[in-house]
Amino acid sequence: MAKIYYIDSENVGDSWIDLLSEDDSRFLVFYTGHSPRIAYPQAIQLMNATNKPEFVECYEGNNGLDFQLVSYLGYELHTDNTNEMVIVSNDTGFDAVVHFWMDRGMNVKRVPRSNASNTQILEIIEPVSDDEIITSL
């Protein structure tokens, strides 16, 4: 197996689904009741994918999903001969785990994903200068 993806669904939503097209990879989707719901187009894509993910339900708590994900990753590093372990998350807190394992010769990395596919796309509003602020009517 080439890669195992550890997906932080609380953080990236369903933006990982397009990764399912990668052959010879395994997908572990960690989720809680706080994970965003999957939209119908992504659900259809998921159902039609030949590479089916495994879903890992996590206990909720402060950073609960994150701790369970890295525990699972550490366990798999010990028992699996996968070439690459990939954490799919925008949470830079995982970078410490990545550096920890890389210092020990393991091929672990974190890749960010845009979660715009399952949430509203927010407009970025340019900040206004003090001259543009209306202070009285």
Task: Give the residues covered by each predicted segment.
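Terminal and domain-boundary accessory regions
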Residues: 1-137
